[in-house]
Amino acid sequence: LLMETNYRSTRSIVERADAFIQRNQERRPKHMRTDNPRGEPIRVVKLADYRNQASYLLQVARDCQRPTAVLYRNNDSALPLLDLLDREGVPYAYRQRESFFFTSPVVRGLTEILHFAFDDCNRESFLRFYYKLDLKLKKQLLTELLRFQREDETVFETLLGADGLEPWQIGRIKAMQTHFARLPQLTSFAALQRIVKYMGYGDYIREQKLDASKLDILLALANQTPETGPFLARLQALRAVTAEGGQEDCPFVLSTIHASKGLEYDRVLLIDVVDGVFPSLQEGEAQSPEDRAALEEERRLFYVGVTRARGRLELLTYGEKFGEPGEAGTSFVRQLLGEVAEPQERLTGPLPRSKPEAGPTAEQIAASEKDYLPGVEVVHKKFGRGLLRNRTGSIATIAFREVGVKKLDLTTCLRGGQIELAHFLPNRA
């Protein structure tokens, strides 16, 4: 049995990481140890929705004063945050690899459809994407009919003015005409949702087995630029931003886990730690040898990300995506933290008498307040669980599940031990 020493991370990180990687079968029998202090426990930040993740990280970047890394499995995961950082003028370093997001089939197809919604006379564009939608007309027929398109005539006007179409074909053309007439009136987010859910593009993604994660990134970017015209222009600008790489010497770093190997940071935030993203595969008895090997590789990658942290490690997860329930579970979080995020002492006898503990110091309260950012879930002793919607100074606006929206003074609540961040607790069968 090999023993290796980790000189970088705290004991709480090393011990958890070592237990986590032991789940892999195809590895040398070795353990990691450290002589470093235990340090603070690993934190889980459970956001209410995926779309809150970029704004949460934006605030972290604004407050950043020491080496901090946002690490992710997929290169495209940084784009929503990169968009906000660039807009707000917040400095960052971006250890990018070549991104194929902007030229991927999903993104190219959806953006071309949006462009066509503003120029529905463009026959060439229409013939490039029509088969991806719920039109079900043959190319030969469409090409023949559109040969007679007049200069001032839309594609749909030409098709509906042709002779010899069957009633069902006319019905599909009219339905698509209605969809395209509506798209320019919608927000960019709603327009993308309409194309995917109601115009057949989602079926095309599934049938062609395209990378659906590109759609989530595109929706997140659309959510940050509501108007469709400016959204399409922003995509072009963001493509140029990704090539620049930010400021090389900035302490706030965005990086894939692969690119972070051999590096270390005072604080590490691992993002998108939800089943279906990281890990992208699930464990199970029916798992093929190929899937099992791929899952072990994802676990090794997660281990690398965890052990980039010298002192503070945070795992970002979320319960919903754009208001819809996401994947049920965060298996890597449970495995890393031993099924429960923070060990809780169970008392079985009478409570022992003890001297009253001193309350937190002003410095401790100030440090804790930095974690209470819009989008995080909190638990109040009196009001229960809620979502922190907004914050001005120490005044937080929180929407509680049971009692509605309230404004609270965070400093007072933290000093009295009345509020805390919602702990991650796994679902139990």
Task: Enumerate the language-model features and the residues they cover.
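A short helix-turn-beta junction within AAA+ P-loop NTPase domains corresponding to the substrate/partner-engaging
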Residues: 1-3
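Helicase P-loop NTPase motor core
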Residues: 5-91, 118, 184, 366-369
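Helical mechanochemical/support elements of P-loop NTPase systems and associated helical scaffolds
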Residues: 6-12, 16-21, 50-53, 74-77, ...
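Conserved nucleotide-binding/hydrolysis micro-motifs of P-loop NTPases
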Residues: 6-10, 39, 75-78, 99-102, ...
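Long, highly charged, low-complexity intrinsically disordered interaction regions
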Residues: 71-130
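Short, charged, surface-exposed secondary-structure boundary motifs
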Residues: 102-106, 408, 417-418
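Conserved helicase C-terminal RecA-like lobe
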Residues: 113-326, 330-339
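C-terminal accessory regions
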Residues: 274-404, 416-429
